[in-house]
């Protein structure tokens, strides 16, 4: 699969997004050269992905020039520049056309393999008969101080954020995709003026067939990705030890991450089985040293891991592979991005299990297999465990499926309703008992009237019918009183 950056690279300056002033300056420069007015070479500078190399090739195509290019993956010492650039700068091409020489990333000249490169470039430029365009990311590096006086500096600058969405939209439509405008804006703003990076992001995200807004939000850090793409390209293309090892010097990535990138892209670059086998062999040896670094905390082994990973991989190929290769982020990163929500949910479940079982998250994982079986086979026990671990409906659904989750929470809801009804009934009974007790405290107790039998009733009636007996009793009372009085008188 061809890399979209190369597939849709503009063939004409008119197709280059933005850079209106830069394009005008380049056209004026090369037209003056064609008219016979010799011009200084142009040093086109700007951040990575701003289109410097693209504009150099586009202007050559517009004005029918052949191109000879030396980039960061090539050896660019004094002898090479003298032989390749020096010859091309003063002669016509085999086709009879004029030649445009492109020296890409001259600010990357470093190491033993590039020794004397800058001084030789200055020497060649003085005698050049053909136009020369140099590109650089950081034109103010001390190593380029002498070169700046020999060239005309043209600022490419970064691509304006508003110029990126139309390009992405056009590429997506040509590839048969319709993308939400919000996603395109997210990718564009994330690129930070780096059109190449934006196109790489678009292609990486569309590898899965579609893009969601969350995928665009979870794009990796732009600076790191920009550096890693450049580093991988250098490692894969070069056959020189120093160039390969220097590719990761300023890289803001761990070696483990670089290893994943190389592993992902090695089969795309190395088409010969022997080269591929050697490359993976060196990569595995690098991984062994990385493991020793982490286990023993001996970081002196780090340089061996780095050398095996970069130079080992680069020198595994018999010959340099020409042409463009589509490099992409490791699929493991894409999968991790897409499973982020699921992993967070699983982590929350394991936390709840760990709290109840007094184990770590790692230890709680061992209970998951049992939970899966229980939730699938025993609904009542699954309900009890859900209540015990305080799982939410979404968490139970994550462990099982929607149907089981629905059944479990239906049971829980029924039990809650039953408990509520029982509680209300008990409350009602308690209120009634309390009311009776309070009523008894307020009202006095009325003694019950004794029951009267039929015989007692007849006796009462008989007494009422014989008044003589009452008279006799009444007449007897004074006698007893007088006797008592007489008795008392004796004491006085």
Swiss-Prot record:
Sequence ranges of Basic and acidic residues compositional bias: 461-482
GO molecular function per UniProt: ATP binding; ATP hydrolysis activity; DNA clamp loader activity
GO biological process: DNA replication
Pfam families linked to this entry: AAA (PF00004), RCF1-5-like_lid (PF21960)
InterPro entries, A to Z: AAA+_ATPase, ATPase_AAA_core, P-loop_NTPase, Rep_factor-C_lsu, RFC_lid
Subunit structure: Heteromultimer composed of small subunits (RfcS) and large subunits (RfcL).
HAMAP family in UniProt: RfcL
Name the UniProt record assigns to this protein: Replication factor C large subunit
